[in-house]
Amino acid sequence: MKLLEYQAKQRFASAGIAVPDGRLARTPDEAAAAAEQLGRIAVKAQVPIGGRGKAGGIAVVDTPEDARREAARILSMDIRGYPVRSVWCETGLSIASELYLGITLDRDRRRFVIIFSTAGGMEIEQVAVDAPEKIAKLWPDPFAGPLAFEVRHLAFAGMAHAPALRDRAAKLAAELVTITTRLYTLAVQLDALTCEINPLVLTPEGQLVAADGKLEIDENAEYRHAELVAEVARDSAGDDGRTGDDPFEVEARKRGLTYVHLDGNIGVIGNGAGLTMNTLDLVKQHGGEPANFLDIGGGASAERVHNALEMVLLDPNVRGVFVNIFGGITRGDEVARGVIAARDDLGITKPLVVRMTGTMEEEGRRLLEEAGIVPATSAPEAAEKIVQLTGNSAP
């Protein structure tokens, strides 16, 4: 469950972390009223994804009339599938430096990792690629939490490649001890998967302020945070009343399908998580980009296959679909009937590549061939074929 920026900042403020003064607006008039109170403000779309600025979802305005106009524009937007239902209007900051401070769950080590960088305002994943020396990490003991000397060491390690901060490094490290401890406590209390401040702004006066925030709660712990879940639902960007859910994943849940939306253009359907993951890898190896992960599970009926194909093709970015089936309790003839029915019922004209092996494989292949769908004989062959048919090129 992903919180909106303003919801994350409210939690930061309650934990004692400084945030800019702001007001939530659901109408252009409310944004104008916020500008009357606060003066020069940033009007920021409240959607649970990044890239708002590039999409035109953030505007800095000087007057109430400008705030009204920009709020009207932003509230009419749909950013990567998320309709903008509210804007956060907050005072601007004078910036001396932009830092990054985040806490996320390291599943391999089974504990939180605290990440600090002087390259704030950028995607931390990109910083890790372009300038890994600017990132420092700390894995605190889960029982003791981050100790002061550990955070100071983290801070100095992160500032080692930032000569502009050298004169104020000691004071900054001391302040980071306080903020990091508070952020960590908040992450634990809220069962967070990610708790991030980016950028953490250092003002010319030396104050650290959370200029943007990201907070994602473990869905398995939602029962412990009923009030927060209810609050998030009120500002939901998803049709099922939950904020932060990808609209395609929302639809898949309604259909009872195990589906993860990705950024590519080749739809992928498999049976079993391992086989489906392997199918994604094969598509990537042959130069394609998967649009999704969809596992139909064992013993899937023709109806379930039909449902899965319909789900995958709801994504307008999908140029073709790769169906990869290993027949154990899943029968090849049932899969073939589902694929054929979906093609005919939905009028599918995009490329379909089907690879199946195992139970009722020969019957399934016969049905596909009679319907004009040529099945692939191996998974690598199928992956290569769908990549070619969808106009992708190998690296």
Predicted segments with their positions:
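Short internal beta-strands
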Residues: T349-T357
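Short amphipathic alpha-helix used as the core "switch/output" element in two-component signaling
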Residues: I340-A342
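Shared catalytic-loop signature of beta/alpha-barrel
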Residues: D333-R337, K350-P351
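Glycine-rich, proline-tolerant flexible connector loops at the mouths of alpha/beta enzymes
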Residues: I325-T330
